[in-house]
A protein has these predicted regions:
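Ubiquitin-like/PB1-type beta-grasp interaction modules and other compact soluble beta-rich domains
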Residues: 1-83
Length: 83
């Protein structure tokens, strides 16, 4: 099955080619996709572990099962502003 990966912030700068359609096995979960990205060293593990994931523009739990055509956004931690 194919899902659309969307990267933001530093992820887009580090791995612009990863912001594309991705082949996954049927029944893959958000956690499985993140594990795959860590194994492939596509994105920095420390930053990846601190990030949120949205599927079809809604925050997703690691157990969420992905389906054909889902849009998966990897959202890095946000910082900045004034105390």
């Amino acid at each position: 099955m194919r899902v659309r990966m969307r990267l933001f912030g530093p992820f887009k700068e580090i791995a612009p080619a990863a912001d594309a359609w991705r082949e996954l096995r049927e029944g893959e979960t958000v956690a499985g996709l993140l594990a795959l990205l860590r194994r492939e060293a596509v994105l920095p593990e420390k930053l990846l572990l601190a990030s949120a994931v949205a599927v079809n523009q809604e925050y997703a739990q690691p157990t969420r099962i992905l389906v054909e055509g889902d849009e998966v956004a990897i959202l890095p931690p946000v910082s900045g502003g004034r105390p």
